[in-house]
UniProtKB/Swiss-Prot annotation:
CDD domains: uS7_Bacteria (cd14869). This is Small ribosomal subunit protein uS7. Signal peptide: none annotated. One of its GO terms (cellular component) is small ribosomal subunit. The keyword Translocase does not apply. The keyword rRNA-binding applies. It comes from the Bacteria. GO terms for biological process: translation. Belongs to the universal ribosomal protein uS7 family. One of its GO terms (molecular function) is tRNA binding. Part of the 30S ribosomal subunit. Contacts proteins S9 and S11. Keywords: Ribonucleoprotein, Ribosomal protein, RNA-binding, rRNA-binding, tRNA-binding. It comes from Sodalis glossinidius (strain morsitans).
């Protein structure tokens, strides 16, 4: 960790088709082995399918799905006097987006549909309707934080 100065976060270029930085980040999270064009093709196909199903715009439908998966609180381990407590802490906005996107991609990869684009479209549409694996993950994290509310005073 540098002591002299805080290094700023690298600026991410917006995605070429929709001009959205959030979508560009999503493509980067989905990308495997540096194959960005493949990841972009998968995301754009999935968004096309999602837009047809929901009747909303591509970005709007994506934003709704992402909104339903974003966590507000999570638990972090904190060691106090020989025992470890799961302390609920609020999630920073950047991490909220990152976790939501990661959970959607993980859930889509575990699905059994034919193509990745179809799996991603199905997971996004499930997330938009407040169901599916990614939303369940968020609810589990929230439940965990709620169960450990008693240790909130150990926050740092």
């Amino acid at each position: 960790m540098p002591r002299r100065r805080v290094i700023g976060q690298r600026k991410i270029l917006p995605d070429p088709k929709f001009g959205s930085e959030l979508l560009a980040k999503f493509v980067n999270i989905l990308m495997v082995d540096g194959k960005k064009s493949t990841a972009e093709a998968i995301v754009y196909t999935a968004l096309e399918t999602l837009a047809q199903r929901s009747g909303k715009g591509h970005l709007e439908a994506f934003e709704v799905a992402l909104d339903n998966v974003r966590p507000t609180v999570e638990v972090k381990s904190r060691r106090v006097g020989g025992s470890t407590y799961q302390v609920p802490v609020e999630v920073r906005p950047v991490r909220r987006n990152a976790l939501a996107m990661r959970w959607i991609v993980e859930a889509a990869r575990k699905r059994g549909d034919k193509s990745m684009a179809l799996r991603l479209a199905n997971e996004l549409s499930d997330a938009a309707e407040n169901k599916g694996t990614a939303v369940k993950k968020r609810e589990d994290v929230h439940r965990m934080a709620d169960a450990n509310k008693a240790f909130a005073h150990y926050r740092w």
